[in-house]
Amino acid sequence: MSAAVVFILFVICLVIAIPVSISLGIVAVLPGAFDSSFTASASYVIRSMLGGIDSFPLLAVPMFVLAGIVMAHGKISQKLFDVFVFFIGKRTAGIPCAVIITCLFYGAISGSAPATVAAVGSMTIPLLMELGYKKDFSTAIVAVAGGLGVIIPPSIPFIMYAMATGESVSDLFLAGIIPGLLIGALLMFYAYYHCKRYGEDKEKINAKVSELRSKGLFSIMKDSIWALLSPVIVLGCIYAGIASPTEAAVISVFYALFVSLFIYKSIKVKEIWGIMVEAMKTYAPILFILAASTAFSRVLTLMQVPQTVSAWILAHFTNEIVLLIVINIFLLIVGMVMDTTPAILILSPILLPIVQSIGMNPIHFGVVMIVNLAIGFVTPPIGVNLFVASSLTDVPVMRIAKKAAPMIGYFLLALLLLTFIPAISLCLL
């Protein structure tokens, strides 16, 4: 069975709404089923699935998922938002910018884009609407800014990329900091432009900020400092050599539980079991996709797909700039129709040799790949962030996408800068 037939069958499975994990499992088994001489028998695929999830670094993923859910229940996003509103709330676009900064910080806690949208959006979208911002704009800005959750470290997709390519998780986390800040800054620039052009209800905004400031800086900081310290502790443990990324993920869970139970007292001990069940329900599908993606990736390697694709692309695109643009367009399209985990695990082994042949750093390519897929979070038809945000406000997905289009444009501008200026990603390494 040829690789082209395998990919066509995979697309057909997706089109007829077979779950991604099952689709991957089916197409991983088919080559061996139709050709008894092919190395990848059914037992090989099963062993590959089990081997794919038998990884110590991978343990960081469920831990970050659990930490994000604990912090969502613990109302930590509210504490983060309050401190940013205190300082910049009265400035032009101060409230939308505070939302974007909150997404940056919450992304540095949860490592997940949909989790960031759900936690920050459920709290900030009603407030934005109360202060006079239109529902479409309020929903769109949270949906797009939530994409920062997979770029700012710790990032679950970076862990997946490290697993697929053998690169350092710590280096990938470090490489994501400046790109995440750059994209956040561009989104804030757009928010400023939008508010300048369409205006704001300054009376309502000033009243809300004045009410918050009446509590005093000490009171706000006392409430917020524990939330602000969370990403500092997690990343500090990694880069100070105190803990590996996996161990830091466990630390983040205990820190989130400690702060939520004993400092903010926003969750009760009896709620912990429900939180753990929610985390398991969130992670279980990811684990199944991960196992099936690993098996499918190994089958493609046995079929020599990476070598074939690499040879074809390098033969037809000799200009490095054109090659990188083509790869970016391909990844953008993939991000629109495929979940992040299988996209990374299947495509990294195929595309990495191609970009390495033109001298591109694997860490740099990892950042470019994740930013491409992050744009897919807010792009129809699969854009997960759009559906999460829509569930919060009942705004139709396509209306959110239309309002988000200018912000996606700034995301694309950042992508171009990151692609052709490697120093943005690599300057901290």
Regions found by a protein language model. Name each.
Residues 1-429:
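Alpha-helical transmembrane segments of multi-pass membrane transport proteins
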